[in-house]
Amino acid sequence: MSSLLAADLMPPGPGTLSDLVPAMGQALTGGGPAGLGLPDATRYVFLLVDGMGQENLEHFRHLAPTLSEMKNCHDLTCYVPSTTATSLSCIGTGAVPGCHGVVGYTFRAPSGRVMNALSWVNGDDPEVIQPHPTAFESLVAAGVTVSSIGPARFQRSGLTRASLRGPRFIPIRDEDDVDERVYKTLKASRSGDASLTYVYERSLDHVGHGEGWQSAAWRSRLMWVDELVGALLDELDPGTALVVTADHGMVDIPDDHRVMVEDEGGLLADVALLAGEPRFRHIYTRRPDEVAQRWRRVLGDRAQVVIGDDAVAADLFGPVDVSTRSRFGDVLAITRGDWAI
């Protein structure tokens, strides 16, 4: 494990996104104190801010005083690839990518096609892609009232059905309305003696992808998120714990650091399918050694190129089920710095 990770990658743990819901569940079900150093509570509100990585927040902490001054802060790592579909699946299932099988923004589905895990284009049945009970479903079965608050269009999305199923879904009509979100969160939190209310906030990530995380628009949205957190802290009932985290951070990519595979030295030779995302490519091929050698030669120090079997052996994705192995690339290209492919 160490030889692969030492080059560029941080090993997951000791606390990961996969551990978060089970950590709250320990207190909610009476199985023991909350894990990960979280406070014990009978009600948790769990706010997931898409795209608000630790380094991004630290850079603009002066714009988010409420977030910056929250107590009991702990570092969590996300498994690779650090992308929304994979990280939300880790959170919702309480499992690692090698188990839940949502291994990127796009990846090779069991059907053999490249599927998009956010839009679910070319996706197989969500319950087939991810058949295991989710962490939310396990809490519901244990008698915990679990609610999910987010945009209405996500209620029956493929990703929700695969990895976030189980909670009662409460749609948000106006994503910019702090009062609506706080009101619905309070109502959901009070709906059971033991409750977990999951609140998904996506706009910071949306702005970051469109404008960049150092843009004025991103900074403005971070201030809005901080306002939302402050409003929740002001209104939540005593004994209710607010847990805030992100699913990944963001890196701005300069135009001249975007590698176009069609224009670079035969990178597509012997490649059957190319999936993943610009910072973490799954490359599917019957000739992994030759393809990896070619990609290393062309990309140089712009990316770390590894054989998929080596990454699996290094436990990069956690233990990998036989049923999910074919979804990971035969070769992986993991960009360095601010490069993208």
Predicted regions and their residues:
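Feature captures the catalytic ectodomains and active-site-proximal regions of enzymes
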Residues: M1-I341
